[in-house]
């Protein structure tokens, strides 16, 4: 990473391990929290102008009374996935960086869909549906087009906005 950060002005941190398997909990935590801590530290060291961290709505607490927004405080519970815990822990690393002087924004997209690999992404639901495999997921999830996420990230990086987080969901 040392070489990658030479002469970099803006960083879009989108990398994460996405898994909802209990066996992947420690790996998710390591990749997502420690990876983000490394990115934050390099941004601070190399005086990056701005960081956009892509988190997830999974890092927000569930609101049993209606819609969730950015102000919800994290309340872990037995139904919270390891992925959710890892993304929340990664967000805490970004907030640490902000406290240390990093100019950063956090975007929390819901389930992202768009052109891509139907085998290893959220698009796998379409692969199942195309084979006639019916399903109905429990709970509720919003979806957003990947192009809308990218436009939102671009806007946030070019706006005079810092030290805030934003939900990014579809219509």
Across the structure, where does each feature detected by a protein language model lie?
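Conserved catalytic-site region of short-chain dehydrogenase/reductase
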Residues: 20, 57-67, 112-118
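Conserved cofactor-binding/catalytic machinery of classical short-chain dehydrogenase/reductase
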Residues: 10, 35-38, 50, 89-90, ...
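Conserved Rossmann-fold NAD(P)-dependent oxidoreductase catalytic core, especially the SDR/UDP-sugar
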Residues: 26, 34-83
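NAD(P)H-binding glycine-rich loop region in Rossmannoid oxidoreductase-like domains
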Residues: 1-34
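Alpha-helical substrate-binding/gating segment
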Residues: 126-135, 139-171
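NAD(P)-dependent short-chain dehydrogenase/reductase
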Residues: 100-143
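Catalytic helix-loop patch of NAD(P)-dependent Rossmann-fold dehydrogenases
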Residues: 30, 65-106, 111, 134-135
């Amino acid at each position: 990473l040392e070489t990658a950060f030479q002469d970099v002005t803006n960083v879009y941190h989108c990398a994460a391990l996405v898994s909802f398997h209990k066996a992947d909990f420690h790996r998710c935590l390591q990749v997502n929290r420690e990876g983000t801590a490394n990115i934050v530290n390099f941004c601070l060291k190399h005086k990056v102008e701005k960081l956009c961290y892509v988190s997830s709505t999974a890092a927000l607490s569930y609101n049993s009374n209606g819609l969730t927004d950015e102000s919800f405080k994290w309340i872990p519970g037995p139904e919270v996935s390891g992925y959710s815990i890892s993304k929340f822990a990664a967000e805490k690393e970004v907030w640490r960086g902000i406290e240390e002087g990093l100019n950063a924004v956090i975007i929390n997209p819901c389930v992202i869909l768009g052109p891509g690999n139907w085998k290893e992404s959220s698009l796998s639901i379409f692969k199942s549906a195309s084979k006639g495999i019916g399903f109905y997921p429990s709970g509720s999830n919003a979806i957003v087009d990947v192009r809308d996420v990218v436009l939102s990230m671009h806007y946030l990086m070019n706006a005079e906005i810092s030290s805030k987080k934003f939900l990014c969901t579809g219509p």
